């Protein structure tokens, strides 16, 4: 039996050429954190934490003493030990995102020690590839928003993506004008999702949903603040577009509350934010028990991409309709050198389809030169 002998964090930092924003966050830099867990036998596992990198790193650094000497195969025991230790002030938010990075790294080790991809250890690979949609269409500084976004989504269409997610939540009238122009540009067959990043109140969200429905929208993501499940329910019941959310709900209890409130039609756990693979599996099972679709949120480096692909491979076919709806993969197309640079072999789409790695663990190798190149310097 091998035991955990070391835990390290790697904060990556990159200044963007052009700043961009969603309705809730402005970006002039990309920062992400990787978690490296090493065993006595030399096996190394990699994870990633969703959210503010320096804060996640500080929490992981506080947690690491509870990992040293533990069996890396005991993922459930480690998860519960960390959660119970910090639960009084850490039931959601960055405490859970920090645990997520650790958990993903431990599952990577587990897969390597057992010579199996993580998806097999989660119960099996229901698919070997997954269609991808492009996430982008943020509002950028110094350009005309509508013409800029239309040109962007046409690039994605030409690359073979089957769908695009548009960022809204700024001004309802302008947002609707954007949706109209994008639909006119891409034609009737390309899927369009809209994401308000909780930029509206419920009254605005209902109005936008009703008006946008004529443009054949797949889902309306984060229409209102994540704390307001009653407002989610109001938006879901008073406009026709399926409602999605979940990237800001952490651990099983937050997801349980949203599912039981019938707040969403589509739940979007992020494997690097919800609590890692250990918690992701629980959320998928509970969502499917309640007839809620699962479409994971993805935002990060190549490690996050690899983890999400393993998670998606193991999502069972939803039994709530005759022809199961397949999950789709969110592929961030904004400026992000870490998406590929941290991996020795890149994970890239081919005409809008992602192949799921089948090597042990996450199925990736880390490029340590890139970790040094993009190392955060406070």
Q: Where are the regions that the model predicts?
A:
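Glycine- and other small-residue-rich loops at beta-strand/loop junctions that grip anionic moieties
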Residues: 48, 99, 167-171, 197-198, ...
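Metal-dependent enolase-superfamily TIM-barrel catalytic cores that perform enediolate-based chemistry
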Residues: 123-239
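Shared catalytic-loop signature of beta/alpha-barrel
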Residues: 57, 210, 216, 227-244, ...
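Metal- or metallocofactor-binding catalytic centers and their adjacent structured scaffolds
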Residues: 38-113
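Structured beta-strand/loop patches that form or line metal/cofactor-binding pockets in enzymes
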Residues: 1-46, 50, 335-340
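C-terminal extensions of enzymes
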Residues: 336-378
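Conserved, mostly hydrophobic/aromatic
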Residues: 4, 35, 42, 63, ...
